[in-house]
A protein has these predicted regions:
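Conserved catalytic-core motifs of GNAT/GCN5-like acyltransferases
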Residues: 1-6, 74-77, 103
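Core segments of cupin and vicinal oxygen chelate
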Residues: 1-21, 25-29
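A short acidic/small-residue loop/turn micro-motif
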Residues: 27-28, 102-104
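Vicinal oxygen chelate
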Residues: 42-95
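Short secondary-structure boundary/capping segments
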Residues: 11-12, 36-39, 77-78
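Residues that flank catalytic or metal-binding motifs in active/ligand-binding sites
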Residues: 9, 16-18, 40-45, 84
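Short glycine-/small-residue motifs
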Residues: 98
Length: 104
């Protein structure tokens, strides 16, 4: 176990270089996501792909050329620390994070 935050209802597990967040739908974080899995809700907040090298402007431009709207680039925490990332939606409405290397 990487980290446990009972106040948030969060357990983080490490698998190699990846970090997996387990959040019960009844906890503080989970209930903020809406209904439990089914027709009205999903069981996934987002998944992440590591992108290196990470050029936010080039990524946003490439996505726009394919009709994909990207969220604003921002520094976010991840499995290896804080680094740049961009959120997009896949064709089924799942949130995908494109994550760059950590910032020193």
């Amino acid at each position: 176990m990487e980290e446990r935050r009972d106040d948030l209802g969060l357990i983080q597990l490490r698998a190699g270089k990846s970090l997996l967040d387990l959040v019960p739908v009844t906890g503080k974080l989970g209930s903020a996501g809406g209904a439990a899995p089914g027709k009205e809700g999903r069981n996934l907040d987002h998944f992440c792909f590591r992108v290196e090298p990470f050029d936010a402007a080039a990524i946003v431009k490439q996505l726009a050329q394919h009709g994909i709207e990207a969220g604003a680039p921002a520094a976010r925490n991840g499995a290896e620390g804080v680094g740049p990332s961009i959120y997009v939606l896949d064709p089924e409405g799942n949130v995908v994070e494109l994550k760059g290397p950590i910032q020193n």
